[in-house]
A protein has these predicted regions:
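Glycine-rich phosphate-binding loop of ATP-dependent small-molecule kinases
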Residues: 1-167
């Protein structure tokens, strides 16, 4: 049971992907859960959308609710990697109160300049969620996902002005 901490764009998702393959445990990414809820038009998704589009943090009660639900699923019984939570002291306290435990914390530290470079080049597939970087990990064909052929887009929360606000 691990928690990955770091600013948006620090590489938590990338490292979580590697660790989950090696350890055979799921990665629980609050960002991915929220984006799926938005795509599916759930009440939680609609509530979160306005915050995310503005580059603001989604309220703690919403985050803790979705994380608690997800961690109750069978694939988390043997461990998990939390990516993006807790982000605040209040979230950490709420996780503890909910009986959610962890064994280790990994904090990823990089400069704001590097974060800006990474996020400005990040593209995500609208269909399958695969992630690319236009310089470091580009798709074979610009704007097209290698995995499913879907359209690659820049997330609204990766726009430079939004990234600055999130830092």
């Amino acid at each position: 049971k691990l928690i990955l901490l770091g600013a948006p764009g620090a590489g938590k998702g990338t490292q979580a992907e590697i660790l989950c393959r090696e350890l055979s445990i799921p990665t629980i990414s609050t960002g991915n859960i929220l984006r799926a809820a938005i795509k599916n038009g759930t009440p939680t998704g609609l509530k979160a959308k306005s915050y995310m589009d503005a580059g603001q943090l989604v309220p703690d009660d919403v985050i803790i609710g979705i994380v608690t639900e997800r961690l109750a699923e069978d694939d988390c019984k043997n461990g998990y990697i939390l990516d993006g939570v807790p982000r605040t002291i209040a979230q950490a306290a709420a996780l503890e109160k909910a009986g959610i435990t962890f064994d280790d914390v990994i904090s990823i530290e990089i400069s704001d300049e590097t974060i800006m470079e990474r996020m400005s080049g990040r593209r995500v597939c609208e269909s399958c969620g695969a992630s690319y970087h236009m310089v470091a990990v580009p798709p074979k064909q610009e704007g097209v996902c290698d995995k499913c052929g879907g359209k690659l887009v820049q997330r609204k929360d990766d726009a430079p002005e939004t990234v600055k606000a999130r830092l």
